Amino acid sequence: MSRRREKTYAPGPEFLAAWPSGASGNRINGLGERATRKASPMFWHPADQHPFGAVQQIAGASCRRTPDAAAAFASAYNYPELSPVNPEPARRTGEEWAEMAKEFALTHDADLFGATTLKDHYIVDGYAIEDQPNVIMLGFSHDYEELKHVPGTAENGRGPAEVGRQYARCTRASYALADWIRRQGFNAKPFPGPRADALLLIPAAIDAGLGELGKHGSLINRTYGSNLRLAGVTTDMPLTTQQMEQFGADDFCLNCRICEDACPPDAISETKQWVRGEERWYVDFDKCIPFFAENAGCAICIAVCPWARPGIAENLLAKMTRRREAMARSRVVAALSDEAAR
């Protein structure tokens, strides 16, 4: 178990001067709203679409000050030109295309592959994704031995540099897959991080079977845990799609406080919150982002998550399975006892 850190963090004067007067990221994100709506443009979207442009600049500068991080992130913004769409599409079944796309992705930098149909709530308000009804989601695992050095400092940039390297993989892999799809005769558009765009990656990744939402607001995969970055590719290629997978991460988070206790600004809630019509895990933007911006992107919560440590996920899955089986047996015994008492 982690030791609960004393919450002594307070933003510095430069950050406080950059924070827009009266603005709340929680309000923009829809915290407390029980009606369903699309997500609004927010952090890492273009600065003219939300009030936190100056805060984004501080976050970028903080990260660039750490050794090697600037070069690592620069590769993430190297967007290659895509091939034109082949006017004569090849003929395959949806299952065949899905298998071929998966094989291509997993041999071109990606560690995980999933596909789902594009849903309206994946698309950020004010944006459009037209005539591309499917979404391919890709996952990229961190080198945990590097990631665990977050947050970065002026002396140690290993953690932020590792984040930058994985975002660079996101770019390479998503652009390579989109290019391959276009050469097969179908339209495709890549959506890598870290810049935000039209597509919300985590909801699409959950529906594509890549994992569950964790208490820390990041995806938890059954193999790599929270030790992941994501990229997406929208396309009109016909694909068989995957189902959501619930393997126990959500139940685990209900009874775990490690990321919650480790968060310096106390931004991670013990309970789920209502956000745009859904009760789910939510990280307090107004508490998180000051520390995130001043400390090279932070990432403490995913580094301390028990699911992130290599080799741990399998043991956690086995533990969760035993717990569910024990609870099922208890319910059967209770039902039999009630029946016998009648």
Positions of predicted regions on the chain:
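Iron-sulfur (Fe-S) cluster-binding modules
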Residues: M1-A115, D125, I129-D131, A303, ...
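Catalytic cores of enzyme domains
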Residues: K102, D111-A326
